[in-house]
Amino acid sequence: MLVCTNRPPVSPVLQLCRFASNVVLFHLKIVKQIKFEFLNVFNLKIKRLQMETEVYYGPRDDSFKDFLIKIFKLMDMGSTRSETSNFLNTYINEETLPYFNMAFTSSSANELNNYELFEQMGDSTIGKFIVWSSYEKFPQLRGKPEAVEIVARMKINLGSKDNLSQIAEDLGMWTFISATEEARHRLKKKLLEDVFEALIGVTEYIIYEFTDTNYSQPGLAYQLVYSLLLKLFDPYILKIDYNTLVDSKNRLKGVFDQYKDKLGLQPVYQSERIVKNDKNVFLSKVYDGNGNFLGEGTAPLKKEAEKKASEVAILTLISNGYKKNIPSLYETL
């Protein structure tokens, strides 16, 4: 049985009220969403501001002093326990600890008393050490003009941020570095590198300043720091190997230099951001001067992606008969 019901027509006023109600609800939802997003952004800014202003202070208790003693003991000063104790007490005491504190404090934690002075000293000392110790470790390089390039590469690799920060982290320096929370979050490698250089600088400075002039000798501070650096760098010393000392981009450039009439003056890189395995990475492709594709590589950093692409390009060129003649001094070592 079919039943028909005739609903009365909705009045225009009621329609308008319903429409207005829907509009209000819609705007309330938008306002709520905007408020939610605003609060999220606001909270993130507050958190970042707190990180920018909140300072982490590394411990300066006995653990800090014990760390310094461990470093100074590597210099092997004193043949007896008494001599060693006198050596340590001379350079690690209430008078010198403020200098060590500065060496482990970044400018983000203290604009005035920070590691920048000692970092400058340590940077020059480490650079000199790497050059001289390279000629000491590899006597076959001495007096050879072509060795300049090899030692320069050694200095670049051993004195790099990656290497110095690794040495510092392996020594356990991170916990003692004072800096803002943001700096510690974003600049860990830089802080480790800088403070390692500052540690070397302040060590040399303190030995120079606090050695009794009646017993001191010219260059004593550097001699002791040199012996310290020999031990600190020993696990990281590189062999004289072309593929180890020269990064892939420079090795690829060397191939182009040798075959520039056929390959062009230099490799051409094209890089773009892509999503790979749900991560943003760089995809770098490399071509010769004639537009021929040689290889590609991906990495989080553009520089690393180009290095990976260069490795592939070198293999491609070798398979096509373009192999660089390695300098003879590398081959004899």
UniProtKB/Swiss-Prot annotation:
The keyword Secreted is assigned to this record: no
Residue ranges annotated for the DRBM domain, each copy included: 250-319
Domain RNase III positions: 81-208
Catalytic activity of the protein: Endonucleolytic cleavage to 5'-phosphomonoester
EC number from the UniProt entry: 3.1.26.3
Gene3D superfamilies the record matches: 3.30.160.20, Ribonuclease III domain
Domain of life the protein comes from: Viruses
GO MF terms, alphabetically ordered: ribonuclease III activity; RNA binding
GO biological process: RNA processing
Keywords: Endonuclease, Hydrolase, Nuclease, RNA-binding
Claim: Hydrolase is one of the keywords in the record: yes
Family stated for the protein in its record: Belongs to the IIV-6 142R family.
Name under which the protein is recorded: Putative ribonuclease 3
The species this protein was found in: Invertebrate iridescent virus 3 (IIV-3)
